[in-house]
A protein has these predicted regions:
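Solvent-exposed interaction surfaces and binding hotspots enriched for charged
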Residues: 1-105
């Protein structure tokens, strides 16, 4: 299985992990670039709008995903099932990642 090395920084903690890519991934580099771009956009929005609730953010992400699933040429239910499975695996990948404190915390 292909793995994408990825790093997240949250609350003075650095997490290095490997995200399990789908077996039919065409370009792991683009997966990483798109992910990084979307995460940065969300982070910038949250910094400008600190009262944004997690619920509102997750609804916005759900709308984004629903839109992309709808306009894709694939069967919606199969894509949603794949996304759910990949999200669960992604959470496991992050949990298994190497965590290290950064800064003076």
């Amino acid at each position: 299985m292909k793995k994408l090395p990825f790093t997240i920084i949250h609350k003075n903690t650095n997490v290095d992990f490997f995200f399990d890519l789908h077996k039919e991934t065409k370009c792991s580099k683009q997966v990483g670039e798109i992910s990084e771009e979307l995460i940065n956009i969300v982070d910038k929005f949250i910094k400008k709008n600190p009262t944004t609730s997690d619920g509102d953010l997750f609804q916005a992400l759900a709308l984004l995903i629903a839109t992309r699933v709808y306009i894709s040429p694939f069967e919606n239910r199969k894509i949603l099932n794949m996304l759910f499975t990949m999200t669960e695996e992604g959470l496991s990948n992050i949990e298994l990642g190497k965590k290290s404190k950064i800064g003076n915390s």
